[in-house]
Amino acid sequence: YIRNGCTYFGINPDWNCPMEGGAFIPDCGSMAKLIEASTGRFPEFFGKPSKHTLDYIIQETGYEPDEIAIVGDRMYTDIAVADQSDVMSILVLSGESTREDVKTSDVKPNVILEDLSEITKML
């Protein structure tokens, strides 16, 4: 079906899913690449960094983009969707991304925190 043009979707383009103890397992993006290698087609993602989910949240809640902040640890999904959607982005360095990633990324977070506990200082 996919080879014949059937539209298919993925949740996110993440390559690895962090696990307890610092281990990683393949995530949705890895699986999508596997399917692409076989079919020549890559999915349309509706999770981050796609705006679909955030647009739905805005529509359903009535919040304006300037009333929303996205908090995340991945530059290429969490911070990217915030950048596309003109909402505040807060990068936490306790996950995947590093300060070096921020320097080399096309998208930049509005705020960088060492970990999520620092968010209370912003409130």
Residue ranges of each PLM-predicted region?
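Asp-based, Mg2+/Mn2+-dependent phosphohydrolase catalytic module
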Residues: 1-123
